[in-house]
Amino acid sequence: MPKPRVVHFLGGLSGIGEDLIYKLVCNNNRCSIVDTWYDLFVSKMSTELEIFSEKPFLFNPDLVNSNDLLLFFALDEKTVDLDGLAGIDCDVIILMNGDSPIEIQDARPNLIYIHDLISYSEVESLANKNLDELFDLCISNAEDFNFPSDKKHWWISQQDVAAGLVRLIDYTTPLPQLMHICGRRGWTIQETFEQLELLYSRTIAGSSGQFQTGHLESKPVIHPTVVKVSQITPSTRPDLSIINEVLVQIDGEGWRPLTPLRTSLMHYLATKDLD
C-alpha cells in the first residue's frame, strides 16, 4: 500500500505559501516545511494544530518519497537553482512570477507562472510594485498624473491561487510542464487606481471618525466608456487554457477565480500602515 502523499514546501513561503499550508493543515494533508520557515509557521498555526491531526514536520530530503509533491516558491527570484532540486525523487512544481520567465530544457520540473498576484502575509511585509505606486498616490492625494491607457493587469487573489493549487495536489496524472495562472478579467491602471482609491478613502474616513454618507454611495466597478475600434488593443492575457483544462479533468470546474478585486485590495490595504 503506497504511503500518503506528502507536500513539501521550499523557497520563499510568505504570502501564498503560508495561505496554502494553512489550507492543507485544515484539510489534514501531510506537509513538511523548510527549516527557515518551520518554527515561524508552526507557531503561527498553534491554535489550528490543537484541532487538526496532521502537524507539519521539518523538511528532510531523505524522507521524500516518489509519490510526494514538492512545491518550490520562487515568486521573488530571478533565477532558480535547478541543480539543488535534481536529486529530489518526486514531482516538483516551481511557482514563479510571470514577469520573470525562465527556460528549462528537460521534462522536470513543472513550472507555474503566476501573473499579477495580489498577495499579503501575516509574517512578512510583501512588496507589489504596481499597487505600491498607486497606494503612494492615494496617500499623497495626487491629482496630476497620467496612466497608460491600454496596459492591463489580470489581477488574481492569493486565496484563489491557493485554492487552485489545493485542487492540483492530489492529481496523480503527470501535469503539463508549463501552466499560467492569472485573473480572467483585465484591469487598466486607471481602473485599478479608482478601486484602490475608493477603498482607501473609506478606510481613512472610518479610522479617523470622519465617515460620511457619501462614503457609502454605491460606486460602479468600472465606468462605461465609448472607445473607438481603432483604439482597442488585442488582449495580452496569459494563456489560461492549460490550467483550465487540467482543473476540468480533476473536478469539472475549470479555472474560476471567485474573489472580487475589491476584496483582494482590502487584504492588500490591511497590511499597510494607514496611521
Regions found by a protein language model. Name each.
Residues M1-N65:
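N-terminal Rossmann/SDR dinucleotide-binding element
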Residues L69-V123:
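Conserved Rossmann-fold NAD(P)-dependent oxidoreductase catalytic core, especially the SDR/UDP-sugar
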Residues L13-L20, W37-L40, L75-D81, D99-P101, ...:
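Short acidic, S/G/P-rich loop/turn micro-motifs used as interaction or catalytic elements
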Residues P2-V7, I21-S32, S241-D275:
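Amphipathic terminal alpha-helices
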Residues E103-R167, L196:
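NAD(P)-dependent short-chain dehydrogenase/reductase
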Residues L20, V42-L49, L82-G87, E103-R108, ...:
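Short, aromatic/basic amphipathic alpha-helical patches
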Residues G164-S235, P257-D275:
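Mid/C-terminal beta-alpha module of Rossmann-like enzyme folds, strongest
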Residues M1-P4, V25-C26, P61-D68, G84-C90, ...:
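Flexible, charged surface loops at secondary-structure boundaries
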